[in-house]
Amino acid sequence: NAIVVGTGNKVEDFGIGFYTKYGDGGVDISPIADCTKTEVWEIGKELGILNKIIEAKPTDGLWDDSRNDEDQIGLNYSQLEEAMENPASKFFEKYSKIRKPNLHKMKPIPICKIKD
């Protein structure tokens, strides 16, 4: 009698698809999925989360080195959020190039409909 709670935010889940399909994307509920990364940090401050945790560079934890999300993506979260909100942003082209190959993660799973 339990559920898996997701940690994905709006930028990662619906902006650029920065998650592992059926990995950190395999959840029952996603309470912060409609929040940008900036909003998640603001919520953390409001909840009294330690600044060193809030200010730590985001990482997916998949690599045994010091690379972080921004190193892998090539844009920081502020730039990604700007591109998501404004197609005229100077970051929009790079954002779109990152997003396009990950769109399959954001679409519902296709199903085969069998007629009766």
Each predicted region: which residue ranges?
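ATP/NTP-dependent adenylation/nucleotidyl-transfer catalytic domains that generate, transfer
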Residues: A2-D116
